Amino acid sequence: LNSEEEALAKARAEGRPVIVDFWADWCTACKELDKIAWSHPAVREEAARFVAVKLDGSEETPAFQAAYEKYGIVGMPTVIFIDSSGKEHPERVMTAIGPDEMVKKLRAIQ
């Protein structure tokens, strides 16, 4: 998926939660998060029930900027979770975390 709107529409239609990952190619912590957490088998297994979209801020397109402002993002990485009812979960990931912590966060989202 290429946009936050596409992810939300798909999630609504399927009754699934959403992961929106704001990242950039110059962001060291974003790369760490990919390497340490997102690539881990346990995280991938738990994340499979989500509709996921990675929003690339490397070029700061208008679509990225609109989503960035909509969610009040202050830096990257920022990962937000939206539950299956469409509500944003109050806890965000704003640094590189390990797989155990990420699995715990994913399991908290219905």
Residue ranges of predicted features:
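Proteins that catalyze or organize thiol-disulfide redox chemistry
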Residues: L1-V51, L55-Q110
